[in-house]
Amino acid sequence: DFDEGMNYAKKEKKPILVNFSGHGCVNCRKMEASVWTDEQVNSILTNDVVLITLFVDDKKKLDTPIIIAENGKKRTLETIGDRNSYLQRVKFGANAQPFYVLLNNEGSPLEKAYVFDENPQNFVAFLEKGLKNYN
């Protein structure tokens, strides 16, 4: 959960890495298999950030649907995936996965977002730049 993760990160005094993903996202699985398994990436994800993974295709119903206005129309967010997808579109202006954004404890981006790129060193550079901007 986004809010839960944000609160935890603030308490731990760590930046947040939000991972917008999908259960059916092939490129997301490729990133996890080829990039997240890199020793340096894994160390940063484990020790230096709070990782929040938000699935945009999660079909689990929200306890309470959320009514929003988007593009001049009322719409109801009924599932966790609906809410996560809405958050990605509205807060970060993107609708593709995988999509990674590093945030400070107030929810502001620390670095330009990162999208699909299977080069572990590029992902490390993204993470390190965000960590530097956090400190």
Predicted regions mapped to residue ranges:
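Thiol-based oxidoreductase modules, predominantly thioredoxin-like and allied folds used
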Residues: 21-23, 32-82
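Loop/turn elements at helix/coil->beta-strand transitions in domains of secreted/extracellular proteins
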Residues: 12-16, 46-52, 95-98, 105-108
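Flexible loop/turn segments at secondary-structure boundaries
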Residues: 24-27, 59-62, 96-98, 108-110
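Non-catalytic, surface beta->alpha helical segment in thiol-disulfide oxidoreductase systems
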Residues: 34-41, 71-135
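Short, solvent-exposed loop/turn and secondary-structure capping segments
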Residues: 29-31, 64, 112-114
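Short active-site neighborhood of thiol/selenol oxidoreductases, capturing the structured segment around
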Residues: 11-29
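A short beta-strand-turn-helix
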Residues: 1-16, 45, 89
